[in-house]
Swiss-Prot record:
Gene designation: gltX
Catalytic activity: tRNA(Glu) + L-glutamate + ATP = L-glutamyl-tRNA(Glu) + AMP + diphosphate
Function: Catalyzes the attachment of glutamate to tRNA(Glu) in a two-step reaction: glutamate is first activated by ATP to form Glu-AMP and then transferred to the acceptor end of tRNA(Glu).
Key word Lipid metabolism present: no
Annotated keywords: Aminoacyl-tRNA synthetase, ATP-binding, Cytoplasm, Ligase, Nucleotide-binding, Protein biosynthesis
Subcellular location per the Swiss-Prot or TrEMBL entry: Cytoplasm
Species of origin: Flavobacterium johnsoniae (strain ATCC 17061 / DSM 2064 / JCM 8514 / BCRC 14874 / CCUG 350202 / NBRC 14942 / NCIMB 11054 / UW101) (Cytophaga johnsonae)
Entry protein name: Glutamate--tRNA ligase
Amino acid sequence: MSKQVRVRFAPSPTGPLHIGGVRTALFNYLFAKKHNGVFYLRIEDTDQTRFVPGAEAYIMEALEWLGISPEETVGKNEKFGPYRQSDRKDLYQKYADQLINSGWAYYAFDTPEALDAHRKQHEAEGKTFIYNHHNREKLDTSLVISAEETAKRIANGEHYVIRFKTPVDETLHLKDIIRGDVKFETNLLDDKVLFKSDGMPTYHLANIVDDHLMETSHVIRGEEWLPSMPLHVLLYRAFGWDAPEFAHLPLILKPVGNGKLSKRDGDKLGFPVFPLEWKTEEGVSSGYREKGFFPEAVVNFLALLGWNDGTDKELFSLEELVEAFDLNRVHKAGAKFDPEKNKWFNHQYLIKQNDADLAKSFSTILEEKGFSTPLEVTTRIVSLIKERAHFVSEFWDLTDFFFQAPSSYDEKASKNWKEETPALMKELISVLENIEDFTSANIETIVKEWLTKNEIGMGKVMQPFRLSLVGALKGPHLFDIVEIIGKEETVSRIQKAISAL
């Protein structure tokens, strides 16, 4: 590319970062890295009424956990700082004034009550009220009152806004990297508010000014911002600046039904839609981190929501995603969020983890349950069951019988306990007690030799044997269980089963 790629993620700190925002950040990160560019984070907090304490720190922590931290942001490499819009508010006034002076904007003094009256009047006539060329010169604006009167009203502290003066009778033919050619009629656009009398710009003005001053080369954002594209392109024209290239990402859709995946869907349907847990007075919304997802799995899953590399490949490291990523392969249509596929990705990353690392995580769970087990034993157990798990948190239900004897026996499996079973189990105890090399392979060899020699069917012993140790017909290789729990515990559990069943 001819100029340096500089892309940004620019969230508003109005609450926890939704998974759709995370994907936007990820695609910006991948694009920047692919083109040896810069990915930066700008905090867009111009609407102070919606500001939520803790949200900014949450956004930064989430990106760090996911491994996609920005190179420039608040307090870090602020080359074009400040990177928080509320800290930049003094500079926006001059750009608003510039638009006034060049005829691209005007002052509007309409009160909320007056605007409401206009809306109601239009509704009564079966029309929709749009603040634009149709009525801007019939309203209380600097387009119809003198410059002296305008200055006097501002000096007297009267509330006003500065609105963009949208051109009339123009068809805008714009280019979007993902959607191709898009067309907008300026007569259908409203004159958006750019600046308020409290000295704060709206999103539209601050966004364009900052993208220009921070040398943003590409704006990669969600599809919900596509209707704002004509205004933003016109603002670049009004300032005489080159516009960046635009790419509008497809929506992430609900797993069932229609519409965009919302912040409420996760709690309602039982899966996380936030990278990290978010606590409020109303309750706790679950996060991927706290649910036991690996950040690499979340990144891999999100990358494939609306993009693929043109092959059937599904598992990508972050480095492989950077190498393969291409905005031209991002889909236009929305991508359905599949919670089961989400878990599948986590399973794929779990089974690739080092057994000892997983054992350390599992040891924390064991300690909470009152079990202190040598790490090498826990590591061996993990190696036997991790293929069956999506999360480390599932390990306990897959392994509880390694740590404690069953307190009950599966009713259906207990039907395998026949009249002759107790006698066979007592014989098995004798066989086990005489084994000196109590290792899985050796135990298996000796037990099977005993079965063959005495012409005893495998099912007559193996199923009751497993039921005695586990309490159900589940679990990894039976003789691995026997070795790990040891001879004494194995014999004790068989004796207990004989008494109970």
